[in-house]
Amino acid sequence: MSNLLTVHQNLPALPVDATSDEVRKNLMDMFRDRQAFSEHTWKMLLSVCRSWAAWCKLNNRKWFPAEPEDVRDYLLYLQARGLAVKTIQQHLGQLNMLHRRSGLPRPSDSNAVSLVMRRIRKENVDAGERAKQALAFERTDFDQVRSLMENSDRCQDIRNLAFLGIAYNTLLRIAEIARIRVKDISRTDGGRMLIHIGRTKTLVSTAGVEKALSLGVTKLVERWISVSGVADDPNNYLFCRVRKNGVAAPSATSQLSTRALEGIFEATHRLIYGAKDDSGQRYLAWSGHSARVGAARDMARAGVSIPEIMQAGGWTNVNIVMNYIRNLDSETGAMVRLLEDGD
């Protein structure tokens, strides 16, 4: 019998005696039932584990279970590489999840790790790091894109406009939009389309959630359905690839990748503003989160409450929403109103 435990082909084998029977079982259960996690979460977990395991091998450390002092050194290594605080926190978060799901204490529960994260945040802020967010795709942007593309007869333009309309209207994540099938669409008495979403990143329920489309966005989606032929099979995904000859390729088995949907945002931004510069910086064009950010900001401007915004976007963390809308009141904050009142 081998004295090594392999949990994944891309991760180093573990000595069996390094953990208890219960921890080993929990760890194997987690990798066996990986479909319980979103595709994005699982990819990030594996990416972090590979990075962490490679660092451990290079520095003669044990990758699992992780020692707090080793995690501390790893986080400082990430900082030295120039990674942003948010990225470093994501690495720690995935290591936390790995240990918690295995029935072990989270590395961040240790004093060594929690203190070094405070240190990293302080040092990075003092060095001039500022939190970045996806470039917002707001109502004015959507209206501009629609005015440019709504009269186009190109199948790709019709698809892209319908996708952007749904993304902004519903605040769904692009992976959630990719999973929409024709059979998930129904009609309200007022003629609006109603999309049934079986699961989201924060909601897994047989009841799902319903997202109503405005009449304007409904027309954009109707046009796409008409020219694409996706309605021929109710099991077809709503959005599909468009061949080089300009003809849609409906499919009930192959959904558009999130990268392809990201590309729609990027291509649309390029259409309006031209190519990105060569600085290599992120968020210089619209991305998969842009519509969610833009819609949240537009709702905040319109006086929609934070709980309502969170419900619309499926957010469970208020800090995420506050980060999206953080600069909206820069010219209308309480002290500005107080000082300028009567001027």
UniProtKB/Swiss-Prot annotation:
InterPro entries: CB (IPR044068), DNA_brk_join_enz (IPR011010), Integrase-like_cat_sf (IPR013762), Integrase_catalytic (IPR002104), Integrase_recombinase_N (IPR010998), Phage_Integrase-like_Recomb (IPR052925). SUPFAM superfamilies: DNA breaking-rejoining enzymes, lambda integrase-like, N-terminal domain. The keyword Aminoacyl-tRNA synthetase does not apply. Residues 18-103 form the Core-binding (CB) domain. The active site is at 173, 289, 292, 315, 324 (o-(3'-phospho-dna)-tyrosine intermediate). PROSITE patterns: CB, TYR_RECOMBINASE. Keywords: DNA integration, DNA recombination, DNA-binding. Disulfide bonds: none annotated. One of its GO terms (biological process) is DNA recombination. Residues 130-338 form the Tyr recombinase domain. Catalyzes site-specific recombination between two 34-base-pair LOXP sites. Its role is to maintain the phage genome as a monomeric unit-copy plasmid in the lysogenic state. Belongs to the 'phage' integrase family. This is Recombinase cre. It comes from Escherichia phage P1. The gene is cre.
